[in-house]
Regions:
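Metallocofactor- and cofactor-centric catalytic cores in central/energy metabolism, strongly enriched
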Residues: 2-146
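Conserved anion/nucleotide-ligand pocket segment
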Residues: 147-151
Length: 151
């Protein structure tokens, strides 16, 4: 189970940047049973199951072009390997994304820099004092970001 991250964790840069975001490996598990089970649930669970059904129909239709649209920093949130696998396995035909998704975050990690698990409740003044940027509950070392920008 993931450890709980509460308000005002850490007091220095090293303690704040101690848990890198891990990218999900879609090949490491079979999610079909849980998604099938969601079709009998409520709220967005049924929507998720229906979306999976539609996606499977799209994959089966050789005349269908599949566009993956991204906004925001989903790659920073742990989806970068997922997107790579979708392309490698011909599960999407095109990607439409904001600059933050591809230029900033993917390039940042391609250079070897990391995103870190954090807290949306962390005091922003403390983060600024430690030269750390925050994307909701994800941290970036500002010095790494500046090195990326200079590349």
């Amino acid at each position: 189970m993931n450890k709980k991250i509460g308000p005002n964790i850490g007091h220095n840069k090293k303690s704040l940047l101690n848990t890198p975001v891990e990218h999900i490996d879609i090949k490491s598990f079979d999610a079909r049973k849980i998604i099938d089970g969601m079709s009998k649930m409520s709220f967005t669970s049924r929507d998720t199951a229906r979306a999976a059904d539609i996606y499977n129909e799209m994959l089966a239709d050789k005349d269908c072009s599949i566009f993956l649209t991204l906004a925001g920093s989903t790659s920073a949130g742990g989806c970068m390997d997922l997107y790579t696998d979708l392309v490698k396995h011909n599960m999407i035909d095109a990607v439409v994304a904001t600059g933050a998704s591809i230029i900033d975050m993917d390039f940042f990690e391609a250079l070897g820099f990391k995103h870190y698990q954090g807290s949306q409740f962390q005091d922003d003044t403390e983060l600024r004092n430690n030269y750390i940027d925050r994307i909701y509950d994800t941290y970036i070392d500002e010095e790494d970001l500046q090195a990326c920008d200079k590349t």
